[in-house]
């Protein structure tokens, strides 16, 4: 039975970043002794809200109320000391330190200026026992499994007497046994009267654990379900879908040529089952899936960033042996990676160097001297044609916006003889104007006969740009939709794991 007074309330929370409104007027309540799930598409605002709750971000508008008091945290340490803990996918622990040291990091017990190891291990042992674990608190963390690391994170929260514990996609790296153990612990925490926030795309987990579900859409509050007997998979999907696809993406029907790219039972690290698909010359195929679907992993394998473990890639009906990126480039297949800053650009080099670095080898003079004339002309051509906003070709690319960095990467591949382009989250972190310019480049490439395979977690973008949508779910293909027939409800239903009897 729901209590009359909420323990945690969000009141009109808004968050704006430069050029991006991440959250708008978020208001809802959470109660002690309940698991409250947060759901929504990628980018709906769930993680941003958790970062506000935990002191990572300050809200632009609104307030967080805990146990009747308006709270504001300067950082995550202040939030943790006030009883608010977030358990992220990427666990924030120190592998070289012991379990006990990680649990009490920042508040190690001292005696005469020296860490009191006996007391430290005793107190940590109590927290470990509380969670039903059988681990020596003096064990270095690096020797434990990911599931055990997660238990240490929870023990760390309990050591601060956390009354609010939020889990952000906590099962993404866990085995089935570890998931069962996590659920056991969460249910115990609920019995103790704590507020549990739970973020997951996995429907079966949501239904197995939740007492209430709040749905977000485009940074806005949609609805809170409190009667779990009256909510099902379709009702949640319907709440998460609420926007028609307009003509803002500029898609138009086009004709295609012969098959240009084919994957025949391809497997790569992170791809659970063999993937087979084909893309024709001039066709744009979108890969859609939720967190952990395997889209990026598939593209990295195709490009030689990781090793394909089974199957074959064909370009123009010819088998391609891809063991490293240079093999893919030589075959005419290019990749714009998801993390453009870490894997796409060379930050401390100029725009000119970033555009020319791949094709440079073909234009050296005498086999060893850089052809400065060609490089200047090529860089200037792509800066103009792609409307890259930069003071000049010699500007360090790290000083450009994300959209202009992405256009420079596209310019790099336009300097090559391209047959296939793989685009992984091509517009992530890019403003609206630059997005439209990227879409126009994609359409232009298709018009030139390039086969385009692009992955995006932005469902409206996939539906708005792609001629055909391939939906991935947990490392396998869940279905395929044509542009003219696809809608958000269909795609999201395919992308989400169905409720099964596996989780009780």
Swiss-Prot record:
Residue ranges annotated for the ABC transporter domain, each copy included: 8-243, 256-499
Protein's cellular compartments: Cell inner membrane
Transmembrane segments: none
SMART domains: AAA (SM00382)
GO molecular function annotations of the record: ABC-type L-arabinose transporter activity; ATP binding; ATP hydrolysis activity
Self-association and partners: The complex is composed of two ATP-binding proteins (AraG), two transmembrane proteins (AraH) and a solute-binding protein (AraF).
Stored PROSITE patterns: ABC_TRANSPORTER_1, ABC_TRANSPORTER_2, ARAG
Superkingdom of the organism of origin: Bacteria
Organism: Escherichia coli (strain UTI89 / UPEC)
UniProt name for this protein: Arabinose import ATP-binding protein AraG
